Amino acid sequence: MKNLSILLLSAFLFLLPLKFASAEKVHGIAMHGTPKYSNNFTHLDYVNPNAPKGGTVKFGSYGSFDNLNRVAFKGSKAAGLGYVNDTLMRRVWDEAFSLYGLIAEKVELPEDRSSITFYLNSNATFHDGSPITRDDVLFSLETFQTKGTPNQKKTYGKVIKTELLGNDGIKMIFENNEDKELPLIIAGFLPIIPKKFYEDLDVTKTFLDIPLGSGPYQVDSLDPGRQIKYKRVEDYWAKDLPVNKGLYNFDTIIYDYYKDSNVLVEAFKVGEYDFRREYNVKRWLSEYDFKAVQNGEVILTEMNNDRPVGMNGLVMNTRRCLLYTSPSPRDIPLSRMPSSA
């Protein structure tokens, strides 16, 4: 009887790690806790699922662009390219950090976050109608691991092994489970690019060819460095997914570029583009009482920023001491003044 008890205890201890290492297929994942939306949600709370579609919206951008290549580190990428390529999952904006199925219909994330497994949506297609396959996902991962930006190489390089599971699963195994955000970053930020379009290109170089994508918009036309125009994909494969309903309603999105920041502001004042975020407090307080504001054509809104923000300040690159608090510099003997070495 004693031997039987020992045998049963051994079997339990053997199966215990398997239990905690296993995971179930789910529709969404969260950085902390569980996602807000259940697996049968129909749309996000902050959208109108029946919003009308049509019209054009114009944005103003500062600078220029010379690149439509999502991979190349060189050059300046055009604004709006994120609309062209879908990711495996979609991040939502009424939760701190949660993602829901997009190209990946379901996902498995073990409790220890040592890996993540994506199960692709069989309806996912590129704009030419060709299916998005696991080969495209693997190609995207490997391309950004080896030829992306330094940050992308570092992040995606933490995937040390991949496995194909069944007909639609792809498992990514990490070098360790120390980075708890890594599974969510891969799910929500890795652009899935078509292998057939990129495999014969030198992806380290810039290009201005219209890229093949899978997202809600595709490039319609461009004037390099001056303007890029996107058109809504009417037969977008994911338009009816709960995570997308009520979004991407404009038929056309245009980004106009301005090489002078003051001209960019003045262009908004006379209606050359439709929306602007103002980060300059002085300008906000002194320059936003123009005619279009007075007659109600432009609506000003102040929004609280509840997120952590970076430091603003001046950093002096010098070896000289810039300021003495006590005693006064004029009271310090020359022999004690800092050298310029």
Task: Annotate each language-model stretch with its function.
Residues 324-331:
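Conserved small/polar residues in nucleotide/adenosyl-binding loops
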Residues 1-8:
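Bacterial N-terminal signal peptides that target proteins for export
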